Design a protein with these regions (language model features):
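A generic structural motif
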Residues: 30-34
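Acidic, metal-coordinating helix/loop segments flanking the phosphotransfer/catalytic sites
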Residues: 38-55
Length: 136
């Protein structure tokens, strides 16, 4: 039995709790683990409890705390933590983010996430291929 540590990303989405985050679904489909926060405050609480996440996917249009403030606090706590900000209408930018996507592009988001953890991504892909071959 293959033991695999899958990357885990913190997704900060402004959709309300109880709804299903599209970003979360896209990332989980790629076989990554996801923690989800629905506000900047909740995100910082989760990040404090689970600081070993592989990266952060941040909605640029949070309501309670600006995405720039969330990103600055994360970088204060862990300067090397990768942060991907997804722009929303009216978004003015986030200077401390490592990546900024102009809109939600699932393929581009996954490309960035896979580049953050290439070895784990390759292992996941190989495992998926092996499982596909076993089926047939």
């Amino acid at each position: 039995m293959l033991c695999m540590n899958r990357p885990c990303f913190l997704v900060i989405d402004r959709e309300f709790p109880g709804s299903v985050s599209t970003r979360k679904l896209v990332i989980e489909t790629a076989k990554f683990n996801v923690l989800t926060a629905y506000s900047g405050k909740e995100a910082l609480d989760i990040f404090t409890r689970f600081p070993a996440v592989s990266g952060i996917v941040l909605d640029g249009g949070l309501d309670d705390v600006s995405s720039s403030d969330v990103a600055r606090e994360v970088k204060r706590l862990q300067p090397k933590m990768p942060i991907i900000v997804i722009a929303t209408p009216g978004f003015t930018g986030c200077p401390v983010a490592d990546y900024q996507l102009e809109s939600f592009d699932p393929a581009k988001l996954l490309e960035i996430l896979r580049s953050l953890k290439p070895e784990a991504s390759a292992a996941i892909e190989k495992r998926n291929e092996d499982l596909s071959r076993e089926k047939y």
